[in-house]
Amino acid sequence: MDLEYQKKLAAKVAGVGLDRVRINPEKIDLVSEAVTRADIRRLIRSGAIEILQKRGISGARKKPRRKGPGSRKGGKYSKLPRKRRWIRKIRALRRELRRMKEQGLIDSKEYRELYAKLSSFNSVSQLRAHVGR
């Protein structure tokens, strides 16, 4: 059975391309009798004709973003503001300090002292060097 007309009509009614129209193989006889747009709409509602979901493009295939220095506009901190940098650094330091305490490298008293002056360290490696273990 040639259902090309019905498929084209369904695509037009649904406002999609031909590739997104799928006719249920079990209900071919019903679809072949459809002639009008109203018939096609009824078949879409009943599920004899299915409109497939639009296919996306995976992140890997997307065009790569141009993030090089030549594309950047704005100052030094417009891409990564000072506050974001601070949050990233302080969270890393706190995480490392907690790990040191759990591993027994520092005791609770040392932990409190270091936590209070955590802002004076620039990096996790500097904190490790200060503890010296």
UniProtKB/Swiss-Prot annotation:
The keyword Ribonucleoprotein applies. Residues 55-83 are annotated as: Disordered. One of its GO terms (cellular component) is cytosolic large ribosomal subunit. SMART domains: Ribosomal_L19e. One of its GO terms (molecular function) is RNA binding. Keywords: Ribonucleoprotein, Ribosomal protein, RNA-binding, rRNA-binding. InterPro entries: 60S_ribosomal_eL19_sf, Ribosomal_eL19, Ribosomal_eL19_dom, Ribosomal_eL19_dom1. The keyword rRNA-binding applies. One of its GO terms (biological process) is translation. Residues 60-83 have a biased composition (Basic residues). Belongs to the eukaryotic ribosomal protein eL19 family. Binds to the 23S rRNA. Part of the 50S ribosomal subunit. This is Large ribosomal subunit protein eL19. It comes from Korarchaeum cryptofilum (strain OPF8).
